Structures are given as C-alpha cells and as structure tokens.
Amino acid sequence: MSRKYFGTDGIRGRVGEFPITPDFVLKLGWAVGMAFRRQGNCRVLIGKDTRSSGYMFESAFEAGLSASGADTLLLGPMPTPGIAYLTRTFHAEAGVVISASHNPHDDNGIKFFSGQGTKLPDDVELMIEELLDAPMTVVESARLGKVSRINDAAGRYIEFCKSSVPTSTDFNGLKVVLDCANGATYKIAPSVFRELGAEVTVLAASPNGLNINDKCGSTHLDGLQAAVVEHHADLGIAFDGDGDRVMMVDHTGAVVDGDELLFLIARDLQESGRLQGGVVGTLMSNLGLELALQELHIPFVRAKVGDRYVMAELLARNWMLGGENSGHIVCCQNTTTGDAIIAALQVLMALKHRGQTLAEARQGIRKCPQVLINVRFKGENDPLEHPSVKEASVRVTEQMGGRGRVLLRKSGTEPLVRVMVEGDEEASVRAHAEQLAKIVSEVCA
C-alpha cells in the first residue's frame, strides 16, 4: 500500500501549502497520539530546528497530542539525532522532529522516531495516515495530555556526543572552523568541540528564524572553505540545518564529502579491530568508495537513497557503519540515525590515530568523476517513465561501455529528478549528464 502523506523522511513542503499547514499538523499530532496510545500510556518528545515556523508547528502538534490524551515533552531547538537519542533515554513512545533539514527557511516538515530512536516502520506510518483520514475526536477534559519542557536537553546531548570518543580524548592544538548553518547545532556543536580541547572558530551560529541554510551549512561550503584558509585552520566542519549531515574541508580548502568521510571512519574501525561486518552506501555512493573499500577487503553494499534505507540494511546485516555522499553517516556503535557531530568526531579520531592531516588521510580513496544535475518537475506524471528518458538512459549506458554508471531517480523530499553519471573521464561524464538532464528537462516542461 502506497503512502499518501509520508515521503522518504516524514512529511515536508512549503510552509502554508498543504500539508505543511497548522490545521494539518494539529490533526497529525492527534493521529500520532492515537496511534501510539493504542499501546497504553503515551509520551512524545518534540524538538525542532531554528525556522521561525517551527514555533507555530510545535504548538499545533502539541495541541493535537493533547487532544488525543498523549503527554508532550518539549526539547526546543535540537539536532535531529539529539531528538532520537533523548527519545530513547526518556523511554518515550515516539520522537518528533520539526525540520526541513537542508532546505530553506520557507520549507518545513515533520519526521518521526520510534521509542528506540529509529525511523518509524512503514506499518506505523500507514496507521497514522489512516487516522489522518478519520474524524478527529477529543478525549474528555480529565484525560487531556500534559505538556512539560526538558530544560537540560542540550546538556544531555552534548555529554552523549562527547561519550562517543574515549574519555581520554584531547583535541588540544587542533584548529577547527565550524559552520552551524544557523541551524539546530548552533549552540551544541561549538560546546562539544571546545570541551574536547579544540580551538574553535564558529560560522553561521546566529539563527534569526529566516537564515537557516542561507548560503551556509553543508550544502553551501564556500564560506567555510575561505574561513579555513584565512584562519590557518587544520580543517573545517559543516553541518546542515538539523544536524544529521556533515561535510568537511581540509586545510587547503578542498571539500571532503560523505563518501570520503565514510571511508576514513571505516578504515579506522578496521585498523583498530572494531569494524563489524562491512559498509552500507547508497545508489549515489561514488564508485571510488566501493573500490577503496574493496582494496581493504571491506564488504560494501548499496541501499536505496535515504538514511532510513541505509539503517534498515545495517540492521538486516548486523553491520555498524553506513552513509550517503551527502553526509548522512550512521555509526551504529554510537547512535541509531545519521549524526553529524558524532560522525565528525569519529573522523577526528581517525586522523588522530594515524597522525595525519585530513588532506593526507583522504588520499586513501580516489573518487571517480561524478556529475549530479537536479531537474525540477511539476505534475503527477513520472518523468522517469517517459520513453524518451528510458531510451536516453540505455543509450548513454551503452556509450560508456561498462566504464561508468547512470542513475536517474526522483528525490524523496523535493520535486526533483536527480541525474547522476559516473565514469573514468570527467569531460565525457559531464557531457553525458548534461545530455540526459536536457532530455529529462524537456519531458518535465
């Protein structure tokens, strides 16, 4: 059964446009409360990023929960993985994240964690969707849900992040620039790295409700690259708006993406005898990652794009490490979802163990040229099912003669078709990608 409201990572869209409206979010809160109250008493945690609309949707969702009889614990601004962690530690039935991740401020969304801190199973999402289409009822006044605030939520999560590295860890002498995307990590990330001894320069840590991800964060690295060089820093770390993606910059200003970071962590875990199984990537993972892991005899498999699918594959195989080139990295030995701060700490530990700079350590992986072009589309028709697009994809694949990959996929969070071509020669890869993107664009017009 297909899902009506849920995408690959909750429900997301433009603020004020269905379903990202106060009335829908109130009904959603009620539906979530009703779904989890079927199992008995229900407590739900709510956290959010720094968008101005987050306050409106927090109030609406909280009202819906109360109407269902479920209790609410408010966390305030908190990285997505922090909400997953606190949902587990407070033994809540569910955690709610009000965020649109790396999207601009005029988007927002709602995503969920189970009581174990993992993404909701499909059957629970379908139950919530059924309730959304049912008439809303309100419990009697004596049974309305209560609301309270967890005042030390940030401190708890800071200590959890620090506990992901050995207690003897000291980054004294390490100069780091952090780009907090004016998002949910703006207070927490600087505290974590400073308390572990690093010398920290902070960018984009003054959220005003409208500047989240605005020319900053993991999808806009220009400012971080310049700052690392200007401050003669050892490296730079960029988070996205809700703190579940991380990208890094070496001391020369060169970008180190999620595939490279995943390799550095995997190699360190293997060298220290801590790697369990192999590594899970996605269909978008660079071929160079697969080849580099192959050289180390580390198994590698690809999941569908989306950290929920990476996590599902990890659980199915009982492996501990996976991620995406966008910077979602899941370290199951520490957490149950992509955690940007913890992933960054694991990379710093890998550098410390080898006594290398980030620029030196990344030489262990040679990425294949890869070009990704996003094509926006409207309407209900699936452009990937159009004969012209299918024929072009087959033709380009044949032209590459087995020396590359073509991947066309729709984004699970935005109305985009992602055109990805990968091969051994950059000019031909770019030409093939532009050729495919042009055909997809014509079909979408």
From Swiss-Prot:
What EC number(s) is this enzyme filed under? 5.4.2.10
Under the heading CDD domains, the entry gives:
GlmM
Give the reaction(s) catalysed. Answer: alpha-D-glucosamine 1-phosphate = D-glucosamine 6-phosphate
Sorted alphabetically, which PROSITE patterns does this protein's record hold?
PGM_PMM
Q: Name one Pfam family in it.
A: PGM_PMM_II
GO biological process terms on file: carbohydrate metabolic process; peptidoglycan biosynthetic process; UDP-N-acetylglucosamine biosynthetic process
Listed under GO cellular component are:
cytosol
Reported cofactor(s): Mg(2+)
The record describes the protein's role as:
Catalyzes the conversion of glucosamine-6-phosphate to glucosamine-1-phosphate.
Identify the NCBIfam families for this entry.
Answer: glmM (TIGR01455), PRK10887.1 (NF008139)
Protein's UniProt name: Phosphoglucosamine mutase
Q: Which organism is it from?
A: Pseudomonas aeruginosa (strain ATCC 15692 / DSM 22644 / CIP 104116 / JCM 14847 / LMG 12228 / 1C / PRS 101 / PAO1)
Q: What lineage is on file? A: Bacteria, Pseudomonadati, Pseudomonadota, Gammaproteobacteria, Pseudomonadales
Task: Name the gene.
Answer: glmM
